[in-house]
Amino acid sequence: MMENNRNFFITIALSVAILTLWQVFYMNPRIEAERETTRIAAEHAQPAQPGQSAQPPAAGSADLPGGATPAMPAEGVPGSGVPGSGVPGAGVPGVLSRQDAIASSGRVRIETPRLAGSINLTGARIDDLVLRDYRATVEPNSPNIELLSPSSLPDGYYAEIGFIGTAAAGALPGPDTVWTAAGDTALTPSTPVTLTFTNESGLTFTRTIAVDNDYLFTISDAIANESGEAVSLSSYGRVARIGTPHVAGFYILHEGLIGVTGEEGLQEIDYSDLAEKREIKPGKSNDGWLGITDKYWAVALVPSGAEAFQPRYAYFDDGRVRYQADFLADPVELAAGETRNVETLVFAGAKETAKIDAYEESRGIRNFDLLIDWGWFYFITKPMFYVIDWLFRLLGNFGLAILATTVLVKAVFFPLANKSYKSMANMKKVQPQLMEIREKYGDDRMKQQQAMMELYKTEKINPLAGCWPVLIQIPVFFALYKVLYVTIEMRHAPFFGWIRDLSAPDPTSVFNLFGLLPYDVPTFLMIGIWPLIMGVTMFLQMRMNPTPPDPTQAMIFNWMPVVFTFMLAAFPAGLVIYWAWNNTLSIIQQGVIMKRQGAKIELWDNLVGLFRKKPKPAE
């Protein structure tokens, strides 16, 4: 039994050591890089003004789906110039400011309770979008998040819907098409806008763009064929991004191109993988969606599904790096005098769970909830989010909701934990008998193990029962970590005091006396108040049990709280608060059960023993 315990503790020690090294040399540098990116974004962003776009999206040039131009199909993928190439400086990153890029073309304003921006009449692109409800940092005067930008900027990012057809169809709506808006109207939830375009062949396109109160645009195209002959055309849509954005690069979070289409289902493609493969084409599909996702924001297209479509994820590097998620619908025949309607949905905004789920249900969008990276433990993570969110609405604070969730989890697992703690209490009762067995059999480990197992069987004790309280926490711990890390609802959610963002690490550090000393400390020394509280509660919980007699086990026993304090210091504050509160509840629960079982609580004796002089070994 002693040998098993030794191996168990050594395994834990090695695991903790690996996690610590991973945290120091892998996670901490990435967290530091993410903080630096946020700081730079905050410095360069401009606050959004009501009714005015704070950041115009880029109308960038990107190759069209299916390797075709708007006028006709083509075998190769032509490199098209930046739409509106008559604008001085267009296509030359850094020449135009954001304001100049927006002002260089005609636009229709977007004014909703949650969005500000504009639609570029060249290409009818949604390329200027600002999120009114979200800011770059926790500071109330920090800039709003600028989601989309014109393509003439280094960080161009936009969504575009157009058509491709045969030469007989003439010039079809594409990147360079200049649409005509009906009057000087703004796009609001109550006032859709109508754009028109008529080509030389007699095809008239009437586009109606509507937006809801949140993040969903509905683009409805009515195509009237007045050319006198039948034509064939296909609708396409694309989300294009210029430049490679900074990503966290953390394995529990996907940032890059994403979609759910065809038999393949969910496709998650990293920027680096797409740059290597250049193009990824899943099978054709009649439903689904595709786009580009960040940690908290996303832009996605939902084809109508009336015709099958070919999804594609592509990378271009012809002077400027571009990533593109696009689709090309099967061609349809439009008889002379016929009018056909095509509808495409565009999601552009924050990945709010309730909104994403509502769109999936009301619009019938297949697996749209996978736009949020719930991970492999989806069946635990998403329900846990909804529990926390429900408690938040009840209590008004996500920190309190996490504490209440911990109590609920404790209640759910109480029967198992209760049985475990009872077994641990019984183990304490038989300690004298175990000592007798060790003395009786000395170095004969085989007989010692047999005698111990017989004693456990007689007393109905499970020697590994003490592991259950820790093991049952592991899936809950990782599910909560996922919720805190990937859900936007936790972003900038405050607790009390100095914790202004539960999704970020505790900003204080003991090494500068929690901010009293005027200098910053390295990331790996950011040991804040809550990590210290967590470490103390873990230390007290471990001291509830006798110190292992084996020196190796005793050393691990003593150092484990210290190691975990350093390791969890860089984790989200909400997770550390959960762990500290969970330890506190476990101490109370274990103490009550042990007292009822008549087992001695070793906490006080172990604490006193830390300050007691150890006897010198006999000469």
Task: Describe the residue ranges of each PLM region.
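Hydrophobic alpha-helical transmembrane segments
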Residues: 404-409, 473, 526-539
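Hydrophobic core segments of alpha-helical transmembrane domains in multi-pass membrane proteins
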Residues: 531, 574-583
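Conserved catalytic motifs of ABC-family nucleotide-binding domains
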Residues: 479-535
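Membrane-interface amphipathic helices and adjacent TM-edge segments
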Residues: 203, 221, 337, 412-477, ...
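Transmembrane alpha-helical segments that form the functional core of multipass membrane systems
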Residues: 369-440, 446-447, 453-457, 477, ...
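Core hydrophobic alpha-helical membrane-spanning segments
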Residues: 9-23, 477-480, 532-536, 562-563
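Transmembrane helix interruption/hinge and helix-loop junction motifs
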Residues: 395-398, 566-576
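Membrane-protein biogenesis/insertion across secretory and organellar systems
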Residues: 1-411, 603-619
